[in-house]
């Protein structure tokens, strides 16, 4: 008889983080996957990070997750998006060698302490009914093997009753040539989970040798490339270029003439696709006034002959794809290695989940990744690590849930959006979703999260020591700058003019001036040069934003006060005077854990919040009396 503390189904980006997190905390963990060889597979684009997404990768890394370290072993073109804007919206991104990424993730997972990997297909799970809610008991594989578990995490990606479409052709699959999961979908439906249908897509893969790069715009990465992980010193792989081309009026004519053949325009038109990553057919239809759309030609590896054309996701028939591609500059003689396609799949309404990502209907069942209605490797990884941590912590009956709030992390923003608002289309993170993005930056994820993770045993002692060393260096340099007084006359010697009022200003305060940076100050304060470049950058960013932090702190304190005003899980909203039936039903279904969470539910009015607060205070005082 096989028994585990935590079982994770799915070996994608979410499943790997969930399994590793649970094992790291000490849970006896089993990861079940259709194929060990596809653990860590990059199903779509060969890249990690981006705007907001790159910050999530840093947050996962700050909690000792895998993604940051793995991409640092596979990065072949690294850049910081939005570098011309403020640090709050910088987006670290790395092009990956697809094979190196997969191998590095597999090496991590297959050698992880407390973690076992099983190659099997799970068709069902069972529960016990000896408590107020059904409780996870076991999983059953396709060959009828029963594996007992206390906690189960579903990270099924696009495999939950997945179907692939290429033109009028369709076949059950969660990924090209990989079977979908049908049994689990039926099991979830039997427990009355609210299931929906979403779709996503991928472009055709191209033969590098059939592309003429000579007339295309070369896109080199940063020099030197920046690592994702706070534990990585540098990127050691050779860096190669991507190339930029674009569609044109001829391309669009081919697409328009064949729109009726594309699955996304025909069979799947009622199923929502990612709004911010539309297919080329949808781009042409929605933006008919545009004569071109960018296409980024991204290499899939250092030794790969395959090019990923980012920007032309399609579900058209193969012959239409070929005709369309040959109208694009550089692709006149292109050969398709693998067809683009669209995939539709089941997802759970994320409002069926708590902030821990445990389901409300089955105790001990957690969901993470695309099954919750999100899109993207990074969003999946962020959910996976939270589900894994909470599943492991909940093995102790007296555990405190690990919940990241909206002012803690982008992961907290994402999960709160999902479980509070739900989603009707694939959810993607943006910096605009975060109210406190001045604090939620890519440079300080470790300062925000690593100590929190260490307190619950999710972070290693080595990483904790690394954090403390960084904090010491940042504090030392900050103090030096605050104690160093600089006159306007000293700055004028270096070509910087500020008010000649003779007033003494600290070097730290001067950094809030957009015309002053660490490079200038280092010519006056020689001690700056004694510190690592990362420390210098960290202190400079903190100083630049310092005046804004003071203003934002009041908002954060108000937010925290509402988040700390807890609503009992067993509260009967029907007993609260003044709530409409509609609001009562919404609150009873959602079961918000706090006043802040209740306030963010659409349709819950300020008056309703006042009534809830009055009810909570009355009953609190009644208990005291």
From Swiss-Prot:
UniProt keyword Signal present: no
Binding site for FAD: 10-15, 122, 181, 370
A GO molecular function held by the record: flavin adenine dinucleotide binding
Residues noted as binding NAD(+) in the record, renumbered to the chain: 273-287
GO CC terms, sorted: cytoplasm
Subunit structure comment from the entry: Homodimer. Heterotetramer of two MnmE and two MnmG subunits.
Family to which this protein belongs: Belongs to the MnmG family.
PANTHER family recorded: GLUCOSE INHIBITED DIVISION PROTEIN A (PTHR11806), PROTEIN MTO1 HOMOLOG, MITOCHONDRIAL (PTHR11806:SF0)
Protein name: tRNA uridine 5-carboxymethylaminomethyl modification enzyme MnmG
Organism per entry: Ehrlichia ruminantium (strain Gardel)
Designated gene of the protein: mnmG
């Amino acid at each position: 008889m096989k028994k585990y503390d935590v079982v994770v189904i799915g070996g994608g980006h979410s499943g790997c983080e969930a399994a590793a997190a649970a094992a790291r905390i000490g849970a006896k963990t089993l990861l079940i996957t259709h194929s060990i060889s596809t653990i860590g597979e990059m199903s779509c684009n060969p890249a990690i990070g981006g705007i907001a997404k790159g910050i999530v990768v840093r947050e996962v890394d700050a909690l000792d997750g895998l993604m940051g370290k793995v991409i640092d072993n596979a990065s072949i073109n690294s850049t910081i998006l939005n570098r011309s804007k403020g640090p709050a919206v910088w987006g670290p991104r790395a092009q990956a060698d697809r094979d190196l990424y997969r191998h590095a993730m597999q090496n991590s997972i297959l050698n992880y302490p407390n973690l076992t990997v099983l190659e099997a297909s799970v068709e069902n799970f069972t529960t016990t009914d000896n408590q107020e809610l059904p409780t996870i008991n076991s999983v059953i594989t396709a060959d009828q093997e029963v594996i007992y578990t206390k906690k189960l995490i579903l990270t099924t990606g696009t495999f939950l009753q997945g179907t692939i479409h290429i033109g009028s052709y369709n076949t059950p699959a969660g990924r090209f040539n990989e079977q979908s999961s049908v049994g689990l979908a039926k099991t979830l439906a039997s427990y009355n989970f609210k299931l929906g249908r979403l779709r996503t897509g991928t472009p055709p893969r191209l033969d590098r040798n059939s592309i003429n790069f000579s007339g295309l715009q070369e896109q080199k990465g940063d020099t030197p490339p920046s690592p994702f992980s706070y534990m990585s010193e540098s990127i050691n792989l050779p860096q190669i270029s991507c190339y930029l081309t674009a569609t044109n009026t001829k391309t669009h004519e081919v697409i328009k003439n064949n729109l009726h053949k594309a699955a996304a325009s025909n069979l799947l038109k009622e199923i929502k696709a990612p709004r911010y990553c539309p297919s080329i057919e949808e781009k042409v239809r929605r933006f008919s006034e545009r004569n071109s759309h960018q296409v980024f030609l991204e290499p899939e590896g250092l030794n790969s002959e395959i090019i990923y054309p980012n920007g032309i996701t399609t579900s058209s028939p193969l012959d239409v794809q070929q005709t369309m591609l040959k109208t694009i500059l550089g692709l006149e003689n292109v050969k398709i290695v693998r067809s683009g396609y669209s995939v539709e799949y089941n997802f759970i309404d994320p409002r069926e989940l708590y902030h821990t990502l445990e389901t409300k209907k089955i105790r001990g069942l957690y969901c993470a990744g695309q099954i919750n209605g999100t899109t993207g490797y990074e969003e999946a990884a962020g959910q996976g690590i939270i589900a894994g941590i909470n599943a492991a912590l909940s093995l102790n009956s007296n555990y405190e849930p690990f919940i990241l709030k909206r002012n803690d992390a982008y992961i907290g923003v994402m999960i709160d959006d999902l479980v509070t608002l739900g989603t009707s289309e694939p959810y993607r993170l943006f910096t605009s979703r975060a109210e406190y993005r001045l604090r939620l930056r890519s440079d300080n994820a470790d300062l925000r999260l690593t100590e929190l993770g260490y307190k619950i045993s999710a972070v290693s002692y080595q990483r904790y020591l690394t954090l403390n060393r960084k904090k010491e260096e940042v504090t030392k340099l900050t103090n030096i700058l605050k104690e160093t007084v600089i006159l306007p006359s000293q700055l004028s010697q270096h070509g910087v003019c500020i008010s000649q009022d003779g007033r003494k200003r600290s070097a730290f305060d001067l950094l809030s001036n957009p015309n002053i940076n660490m490079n200038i100050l280092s010519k006056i304060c020689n001690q700056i040069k004694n510190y690592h470049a990362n420390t210098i950058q960290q202190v400079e960013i903190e100083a630049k934003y310092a005046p804004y932090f003071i203003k934002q702190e009041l908002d954060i304190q108000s937010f925290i006060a509402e988040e700390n005003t807890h609503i009992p899980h067993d509260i009967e909203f029907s007993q609260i005077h003044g709530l409409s039936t509609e609001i009562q039903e919404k609150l009873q279904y959602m079961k918000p854990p706090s006043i802040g969470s209740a306030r963010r539910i659409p349709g819950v009015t300020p008056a309703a919040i006042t009534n809830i607060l009055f009810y909570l205070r009355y009953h609190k005082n009644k208990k005291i009396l």
